């Protein structure tokens, strides 16, 4: 299983040699992780991870969705159900099931990330299998008890410079405060994710809004609601936040008059919003968040286009983030126009657009980001955060948007040990792409070195104000 030093590079010798040189120049750059879903309590408490299954299997919906697709119940993977049905609690049994089915992950990015962690973090070069499952489980479990495997030690070992978590608008951020108070040098910052108090289609929307204005100490009115967001954004900024994040079903925006927006708020806060009112409210709030970003400087990320909880049976029994979110088409040109008409020409605003609709990359997103000063393209995301996905992204966007209307790489992960693996993969694929441009005489090699550095490090640091 030993990692091949030429993985993800071209098989053509000349191009491969260029890629080697480029990668050598960026391989050891610090990691900027400006968007992700690791838990702030890890860094605050610095406790040992419990066991291999809890580290690699249970929290990783890339893993659990593949196993579920092959008929393995989520309970057998240790996922707790809402209805109290028993789920597997024996970490070794969960690991054995994972190991027995490891062949399912052939040619997937999950395999690349996992095997990178096995070798570079644990020193394990055997390919996982049913036969060696217990031995590898024991080897990992033994190392997890050691001080060098605590979250803060791994932060240094991974050469992370900054990492952003993703946090609800009403989160008190106590673990971020604990990190700051501890005097530890690690930079763990929050990102403002207000979806629960913005998505009027959620059954708990009204209660989330009440919680928001309660925490902020503002009245339950349209203006009070907006002031509550401003209050919380400032609270996040004082703890280092540089960005907000918005995971909406679509990229629809709106620019209503103050009166129309206030009346819309009065309708949706009653808790029985129509589908059209819920969509209009989300749309208006993207524009309001852009307005706030101009005032307070938070970089705005929009992650649209996921059909969340496509499998109602899984959602009802297990809740969110269980692998049943499916990409859907997204129409950026028309949906973003109200926001862009209002603020798209303002260089004080940075809106980073992500997509699960690859067909939109060359047709809509690259032309939009290649024109509007306020827009940047986020990297290949979620299902497409893979060698082929990143390569397609570069091929579909570079000719129209260039490199400098993109923002480098986000690992966007819940799996802490996959962070260096994901950055390694992105750097390798980008270097392979740049090597091809050099070999085709479309880019000079000295330029390729500069671009490789920018894609691996500078663009993320600059765009996210880190």
From Swiss-Prot:
Instruction: Write down what this protein is called.
Output: Uronate isomerase
Q: InterPro entries recorded for this chain?
A: Metal_Hydrolase (IPR032466), Uronate_isomerase (IPR003766)
| Record keywords, A-Z | Isomerase
HAMAP family membership: UxaC
Organism, by scientific name, is Brucella melitensis biotype 1 (strain ATCC 23456 / CCUG 17765 / NCTC 10094 / 16M)
Task: Name the Gene Ontology molecular function terms of this record.
Answer: glucuronate isomerase activity
Family note:
Belongs to the metallo-dependent hydrolases superfamily. Uronate isomerase family.
This protein's encoding gene: uxaC
- Which cysteines are disulphide-bonded? none
Documented EC number(s): 5.3.1.12
Pathway named in the protein's UniProt entry: Carbohydrate metabolism; pentose and glucuronate interconversion
What Gene Ontology biological process does one annotation of this record name? D-glucuronate catabolic process
Q: Which PANTHER family match?
A: URONATE ISOMERASE
Where does the source fall among the domains of life? Bacteria
List the catalytic activities from the record: D-glucuronate = D-fructuronate; aldehydo-D-galacturonate = keto-D-tagaturonate
Q: Which Gene3D superfamilies match?
A: Metal-dependent hydrolases, uronate isomerase, domain 2, chain A
- Top EC class, one word: isomerase
